Regions:
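Glycine-aromatic micro-motifs
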Residues: 1-133
């Protein structure tokens, strides 16, 4: 069952992490990155200017393709949770994706109140399951 993904959309901003690949690492890591982000047509690649603590950098980002039929701008929380709870993809359960994203952002000092609330609800679900379920 398809799930939901986080994506950059035009008209906003994003706090996150910028990764640098050394030139000799590009052939090793870039094909898998490109395949993961571009295989469904849900994203469009764009070079943008980013501000970092070390100064400005150009970065390749993958923004939402609003023309893709899977594009969803916003959902009520109850509907979002229902989809996430039942969905899984080639990288695992959607619940893990949401919770791990929230944990990674918190570890990087980035706090998103809505995402944190959703992740807490999903974590509570997992604690309510009987042992071995």
């Amino acid at each position: 069952m398809p799930g939901l993904v986080f994506g950059l959309d035009r008209g906003g901003s994003c706090r996150g992490v910028v990764y640098r690949l050394a030139g000799d690492q590009v052939p090793t890591y870039f094909p898998a990155l490109w395949d993961r982000e571009m295989s469904t047509g849900a994203y469009l690649p764009r070079w943008i200017n980013c501000s970092t603590e070390a100064g400005p950098v150009r970065a390749l980002v993958f923004i939402m393709n609003r023309d893709n039929p899977a594009y969803i701008r916003a959902l009520p929380e109850a509907e979002l949770l229902a989809i996430v709870r039942r969905a899984a993809g080639r990288y695992g359960p959607c619940t893990d994706y949401v919770v791990q994203t929230a944990q990674a952002l918190r570890a990087a000092g980035i706090h998103d109140a809505r995402l944190d609330a959703i992740a807490r609800r999903l974590e509570q679900d997992s604690h309510a399951l009987p042992e071995g379920a």
